[in-house]
Amino acid sequence: MTTTKPVKQIMHERKSVRKYNANTTISRETIMQLLEDATSSPSSSNMQPWRFIVIDDKEIQKNINIFSFNQEQIETASAIIAVIGDTEMYLNAEEIYSKNVELGYMPEEIASKLAQDSLAMYGAIPKEALLNIIHFDAGLISMQIMLLAKEMGYDTVPMGGFDKSKFAEYMELPSNEVPILLLAIGEAAGPAYGSSRLPIERLVRFNK
């Protein structure tokens, strides 16, 4: 279903879809490829704090809707992608930078220093600041997921309105993983509403 549309066209065609064809399935292979492509997203120090739980079991979708304010799309979408943030993402610094050396992206001495700096810096950051970084990075990759999904012919809607504590408890998340948002993905059952934007002149200033 992948298209060859220009990125700009995909951006403008993407809408938040809340009504899905409940009979449409998306293969796990397709979703894995989608998420792998999305991980090209930038992140702070390339620490890649995102984790994903793909929920494609209808019974589980129904269960999580109990603490997601009974949103129709939770149950009718082909899958729900839960975007999770890992507050211990910096513990992967050595693995990440060693891979950069292996791939020829940087010399070993620079990679070693960057890994040590990341471990020291992120290990000392207050939790609130760390959560801000993780939420920012999660927003970047979530946008990539939605655009890539649209390119593949699927629609999405991001949802921040759910009880994150109850979700974490239900999914038995470890203490270092925090739920950030839910992304519904599937085939639209009808056209989405359009949405206006404020004039760009009101949103932009130059130099001050």
Spans of model-derived segments:
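Acidic, surface-exposed loops and disordered segments
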Residues: 1-208
